[in-house]
């Protein structure tokens, strides 16, 4: 399910919110995808030469013993995202991925977030897809803005919906990995308002 809205930053840009269990892909430079993550993981993927990209939002790595083709599960969500990009003209060998989410949000969710993060990284390694940036783990929710044709990502941490004691999220970026922007958002901030970019 997708929610659409017009960006307040640029009326020419269409913002599409990606819900849990969904994926989208596009070659339209006027589209920006957003999603909010807790224990879920999203894969932002782009072919920077063909200028096509897409994003998914999955809840669990696997469906268990039964293989169910459902976008809530990482193995299917990443596979279908790759296929959708290839249909738009991407070259599999040029695909670049960025991973976000996988937080430990509540005790009830246990190791769901870390399991999602481990799965996504292993899947990309096994498929020989270059993971150029990642921000995984921690205890805070994240809001992501992804520009599919450039691969540019903005990330904002949402402290107002924390459910566990604060802890610095584990963030790892490769040198020269492309552009990822990080923001902190306190309890009095508007989660939809992204501040100045930090480089």
Swiss-Prot record:
CDD domains: CheD. GO terms for biological process: chemotaxis. It catalyses: L-glutaminyl-[protein] + H2O = L-glutamyl-[protein] + NH4(+). It holds the Pfam family CheD. It comes from the Bacteria. One of its GO terms (molecular function) is protein-glutamine glutaminase activity. Its EC number is 3.5.1.44. Keywords: Chemotaxis, Hydrolase. Signal peptide: none annotated. Gene3D superfamilies: 3.30.1330.200. HAMAP family: CheD. Belongs to the CheD family. Probably deamidates glutamine residues to glutamate on methyl-accepting chemotaxis receptors (MCPs), playing an important role in chemotaxis. This is Probable chemoreceptor glutamine deamidase CheD. It comes from Cereibacter sphaeroides (strain ATCC 17025 / ATH 2.4.3). The gene is cheD.
């Amino acid at each position: 399910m997708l929610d659409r809205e017009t960006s307040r930053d640029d009326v020419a840009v269409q913002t599409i919110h990606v819900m849990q269990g969904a994926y989208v892909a596009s070659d339209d430079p006027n589209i920006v995808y957003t999603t909010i993550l807790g224990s879920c993981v999203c894969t932002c993927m782009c072919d920077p030469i063909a200028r096509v990209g897409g994003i998914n939002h999955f809840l669990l790595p696997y469906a268990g013993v039964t293989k169910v083709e459902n976008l809530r599960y990482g193995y299917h969500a990443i596979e279908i995202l790759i296929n959708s990009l290839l249909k738009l003209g991407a070259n599999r060998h040029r695909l670049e991925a960025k991973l976000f989410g996988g937080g430990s949000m509540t005790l009830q969710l246990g190791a769901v977030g870390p399991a999602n993060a481990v799965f996504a990284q292993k899947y990309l390694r096994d498929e020989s897809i270059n993971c150029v940036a990642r921000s995984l783990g921690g205890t805070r929710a994240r809001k992501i803005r992804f520009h599919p044709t450039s691969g540019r990502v903005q990330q904002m941490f949402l402290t107002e919906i924390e459910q566990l004691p604060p802890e610095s999220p584990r963030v790892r970026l490769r040198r020269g990995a492309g552009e990822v922007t990080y923001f902190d958002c306190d309890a009095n901030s508007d989660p939809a308002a992204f501040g100045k970019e930090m480089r």
